[in-house]
Amino acid sequence: MLLKDKIIAVIYGGRSAEREVSLESGERVTQALINKGYKVEAIDLFGPGGRLNPVKQLSDAHFDFAFIALHGGEGEDGRVQAVLDMLQKPYTGSRPLASGFAMDKALTKKYWQGLGIPTPNYLCFSDKPDLEKIHREMSFPLIIKPSREGSTIGISKVHTQAELTKALEDAKKYDSDILVEEFVSGPEFTVTIIDDVAYAPIGLKPSSEHELYDYEAKYIAEDTQYLLPCGLSDDLELEVQALALEAYRSLNCSGWGRVDIMQGSDGCFTVLEVNTSPGMTSHSLVPMAANYAGIDYDSLVEMIAEQAWHSFLETC
């Protein structure tokens, strides 16, 4: 069975804080599939046709396979994936449990610590943050972030008590669980994984106006530097790729994803998070890594879709 004989639903939009990013990802993925000769049905989840009942929106749509271009919320935490499983519609990316696991940063960090996969020390608070515990166990600067949000939305770097209080309040707007993480002083890298193959790491260097590679540095700023090659030696590049694969596989992720990694002042690498539904916008990192490997955007989208389709056929 050829995927080109089927109808592909590109599911995008959603209602998370990353909706605007997803809208661009979905539009670009849709056009890429059309350019490659596929039959496409674009579905803006929670858009005009699905605000009241997105499950019905999906069940009423006529398609055979889904390319998930949702970011954050139910589009990345396993809920949409579970609905598609119940509808018996194959799709790109990780299964429901892996998606939900990876979306919860606190849960993955606790798991990685048990496995011996290096990740920055942290505290997680579900209710009111314990400021005394934070001061007792950690020292400034700190990173404050929602535990289950993407695109670095709600993230802050804090140096003082006043900044900490405000950052905790800001992060609470996006999630009930808040992560307080030690700041790793050093360069940041991201590794794209497609079909269990790690691509060349990209070095991320925000401008001097941005302390972090945050939402603005990702999607708005024009002066963020993306380093390819990333500036590491060949041996260290291989080390970063191996660590990314170890973190990705530990969560039982599949299809494609992206792993964010920091290098500390001691030269050691630590894993920040795994993204199971990365951005596919004009500023996004997965297309950048693929392009460096000689894969253009349209071919990248086709590769992700075909890999997922063939994996589905192997299980039939």
Residue ranges: model-predicted function:
Residues 82-90, 115, 194, 292-293:
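Alpha-helix C-terminal capping segments
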Residues 1-11, 58, 101-187:
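Active-site nucleotide/adenylate-binding loops and adjacent lid/helix of ATP-dependent enzymes
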Residues 80-85, 212-220, 276:
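Short, flexible, mixed-charge acidic loops at enzyme active sites
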Residues 1-97, 101-103, 107, 126-133, ...:
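ATP-binding N-terminal substructure of ATP-dependent carboxylate-amine bond-forming enzymes
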Residues 3-6, 233-316:
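ATP-dependent carboxylate activation and anion-phosphoryl transfer catalytic cores
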Residues 159-242, 263-270:
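Phosphate-binding site of ATP-dependent enzymes
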Residues 40, 90-91, 119, 142, ...:
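Hydrophobic beta-strand scaffold residues
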